[in-house]
């Protein structure tokens, strides 16, 4: 069985551009996982640890900021970013 691709490195802050970025394209699966976790009512700390690979017990502020910014970006993708994908961007 082939190994799955490694998770891409997660920045402390997701992009805030009004355009789709290379980071967004690379982290599209991460955004989907964050949206799924929110829908399921998962604890933010557990999501940060599992999805973003940041331990909230060791780095609570960093974990919270990364989770908040990436979840906000995931929501942006559902409202605006997907349009850039449809246009081939």
Report the location of each language-model feature.
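Short helix/strand-capping connector loops at secondary-structure junctions
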Residues: 13, 49-62
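Charged, low-complexity regulatory segments of eukaryotic nuclear chromatin/transcription proteins
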Residues: 80-89
């Amino acid at each position: 069985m082939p190994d799955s691709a490694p998770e891409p490195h997660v920045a402390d802050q997701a992009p805030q551009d009004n355009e789709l970025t290379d980071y967004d394209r690379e982290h599209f699966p991460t955004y989907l996982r964050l949206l799924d976790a929110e829908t399921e009512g998962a604890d933010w700390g557990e999501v940060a640890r599992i999805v973003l690979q940041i331990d909230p017990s060791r780095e609570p502020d960093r974990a919270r900021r990364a989770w908040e910014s990436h979840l906000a970006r995931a929501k942006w993708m559902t409202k605006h970013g997907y349009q850039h994908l449809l246009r081939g961007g």
